[in-house]
Structures are given as structure tokens and as C-alpha cells.
Amino acid sequence: QKKDKKDK
């Protein structure tokens, strides 16, 4: 399980 890097 890879967590998407979506932090804005």
C-alpha cells in the first residue's frame, strides 16, 4: 500500500 503524496 503506497500512500499518494498529495499534501497542499
From Swiss-Prot:
One of its GO terms (cellular component) is extracellular region. Keywords: Pyrrolidone carboxylic acid, Secreted. The keyword Iron does not apply. Expressed by the venom gland. The keyword Zinc does not apply. The modification Pyrrolidone carboxylic acid is found at residue 1. It is found in: Secreted. Belongs to the tachykinin family. This is Tachykinin-like peptide-II. It comes from Phoneutria nigriventer. The lineage of its organism: Eukaryota, Metazoa, Ecdysozoa, Arthropoda, Chelicerata.
